């Protein structure tokens, strides 16, 4: 059994408040859960233009886990509401 982990730091240039950030982040989290069936977590909660999203998936084959994590990163790169600052991927 393999576990895939992806941590993505994003910058939200249009977010002028924590409320606006929450709207954008909740939308991202919901879409990612529905589209890719993965677990999503967010931090820090107190900064209004920076977010760190962590994604985790589990599968029996390493190839499937790597593909899923790559699809998540690729999907997020083409969203227009934020910029990806950093991306870290690991498979255990």
Q: Whereabouts are the PLM-identified features?
A:
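C-terminal binding/interaction regions
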Residues: 21
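Short, charge-patterned binding micro-sites
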Residues: 3, 42-61, 90
């Amino acid at each position: 059994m393999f576990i895939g982990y992806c941590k993505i730091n994003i910058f939200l240039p249009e977010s002028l408040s924590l409320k606006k950030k929450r709207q954008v982040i909740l939308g991202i989290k919901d879409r990612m859960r529905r589209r890719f069936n993965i677990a999503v977590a967010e931090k820090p909660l107190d900064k209004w233009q920076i977010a760190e999203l962590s994604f985790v998936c589990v599968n029996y084959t390493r190839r499937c886990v790597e593909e899923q994590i790559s699809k998540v990163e690729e999907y997020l790169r083409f969203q227009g509401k934020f910029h990806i600052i950093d991306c870290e991927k690991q498979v255990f």
